[in-house]
Amino acid sequence: MGMSWWLACAAAFSALCVLKASSLDTFLAAVYEHAVILPKDTLLPVSHSEALALMNQNLDLLEGAIVSAAKQGAHIIVTPEDGIYGVRFTRDTIYPYLEEIPDPQVNWIPCDNPKRFGSTPVQERLSCLAKNNSIYVVANMGDKKPCNTSDSHCPPDGRFQYNTDVVFDSQGKLVARYHKQNIFMGEDQFNVPMEPEFVTFDTPFGKFGVFTCFDILFHDPAVTLVTEFQVDTILFPTAWMDVLPHLAAIEFHSAWAMGMGVNFLAANLHNPSRRMTGSGIYAPDSPRVFHYDRKTQEGKLLFAQLKSHPIHSPVNWTSYASSVESTPTKTQEFQSIVFFDEFTFVELKGIKGNYTVCQNDLCCHLSYQMSEKRADEVYAFGAFDGLHTVEGQYYLQICILLKCKTTNLRTCGSSVDTAFTRFEMFSLSGTFGTRYVFPEVLLSEVKLAPGEFQVSSDGRLVSLKPTSGPVLTIGLFGRLYGKDWASNASSDFIAHSLIIMLIVTPIIHYLC
C-alpha cells in the first residue's frame, strides 16, 4: 500500500513536470512580408505544371524565410495571403493553382504521405518545411471542393473554390484549415463559405485563431474567436492595400490587437505599386515590431517575443466621455470626406486646446498641446457616426485627429503620409455605442508609436510622453456590428454615399 502510494505520487509529479516543460510562458513569433512573384496576365488558364512552377518560385522565397526564422529560434511563422500565387485571377484562371485541402481531423502529415488526398505538392512542401525546421508554418493557398450541380448551392462549374489559410505544426501535421468568410470585391475567383468557420488550435505557447484580411472588419469570425473561443493570438495572412488616414495596415492591425486584447501576427504582401506593405507583430499593450516600406521591392522577415497568454484589462469606452459636457461650437464645424464617409470636423486653431465635435449619437472630446503651431500645416478633429457603404458595408463610430493634406480644409481626410508637427500631449475619448473600439496613433512616414500612449480604463486614449515624430493620425475606430445591415439604412443615405464616391475620386481604394 505504502509503496503504491509513493509510486502514484512519483508518477503524478513526473506528469506535472512534463506538462510544465511543454508549456511556454513566451514564444518567438515571426512574420514574413513577401514580395510575391506574380503570374503573367492571361484570359485563359495556364497548365497545372506552369501554375506549379510559379508557386514553387514563391515557395523558394518562403522557404528562405522559414529556414531563417527557424534558425533564429522562432516557434511560428506567418506568411501572406496570396503569397504563393499572387493576385488578379478569374474563377477559371485560378483553378490550376488549387489543391483539395482536407479537414485537419484526418490526422495527416503531407510530408510523410503526400498522395493520400491526391496531388498535393504545395501542401507537401509546406508540411516538409514545417517538419524539417521544427516550426509552425502558416500559409495561404486555394482550396477546391467538388459539388453536385443539382445542389442549389453548388456553382455551375461543379466546384467550390476557397481562399484558404493552412497551418502545419512543427511535426508537419496539418492542424488548421480556414476558408475566408468575408470576400473582398474583386475576389470573384473564390466562394463564400455557407457558414463562418471558427478555426482554432492549441500549442504549448497558447491558443491560436486564424482569419484573413477583410475578415478583420467584421464580427465573424474575428471577434467571436476572441470573445467566445478565448484565443491568445491571431494569425493574419493579408494582402492589404493601405487606405490613409485611418486604415493603413500597421495602423489598424495594431489597433485591433490593442482593442481586442490579443497578440496579432500580420503578414502582408509586399507590392508598393499596389500600395501593399505593412506587416507586424503586435501585443495588446503595444506593437512589438512593424515594417512599412514603399521604396524597395524587397521582402522582410520580422521577429518578436510575445507572452503566450497576454493579459487584457477591460475598458469602459464611454465612462470618461459621457461625463464631459457636450457643447460643440457649431460655427467652427465643417464637413469633409474620409474614405467616402462625410465627417464633421473642427479645425485645431491654437497650439493647445480642448474641443468637442458631435455627429448623430457620437460626441468626441479632445485635449491636446502641439510642440508648435505651424502656419503651413492644418490639423482637424472629427467625428463620424454612420454606415460605410463603399467597398463593403459596415457601421462605424470614429473620433479622429488628423493632419490635412493642405491648408485647404476640404483636403482634411485625404491621404497624406508626411507631417512636421509633434504633439506634447493628447487625450481623446468618445461616447461610443460599442465596446469594440480600436485605438490608432500614426506618425509621419507611416510609423507607429510603441510605448508612447495607452488606453485608460475609462476609455481615454492618452499620451504617455511627447510623440517621437510628427503626427498623421490619432483616432478611436469603433465598430457597431449589429447595425451593419440595419433596416434604417435608407436608400437615400446609400445613394448619398454613392454620389460622394463618384464626386470625390474615380480611383478605387482597395483594402484587401
From Swiss-Prot:
Q: Which UniProt keywords apply?
A: Cell membrane, Glycoprotein, GPI-anchor, Hydrolase, Lipoprotein, Membrane, Signal
Q: Where in the cell is it found?
A: Cell membrane
- The active site lies at 81 (proton acceptor), 180 (proton donor), 213 (nucleophile)
Q: How is it modified after translation?
A: N-glycosylated.
The organism's taxonomy opens as: Eukaryota, Metazoa, Chordata, Craniata, Vertebrata
Organism domain of life: Eukaryota
Complex formation:
Monomer.
Q: MF terms per GO, please?
A: GPI anchor binding; pantetheine hydrolase activity
Q: List the membrane topology term(s).
A: Lipid-anchor; GPI-anchor
Please state what the protein is called.
Pantetheinase
Q: Which InterPro entries match?
A: Biotinidase-like_euk, Biotinidase/VNN, C-N_Hydrolase, C-N_Hydrolase_sf, Vanin_C
Q: Which organism is it from?
A: Mus musculus (Mouse)
UniProt entry tagged with the keyword Acyltransferase = no
What Enzyme Commission number(s) does the record list for this chain? 3.5.1.92
Known role: Amidohydrolase that hydrolyzes specifically one of the carboamide linkages in D-pantetheine thus recycling pantothenic acid (vitamin B5) and releasing cysteamine.
Substrates-to-products reaction catalysed: (R)-pantetheine + H2O = cysteamine + (R)-pantothenate
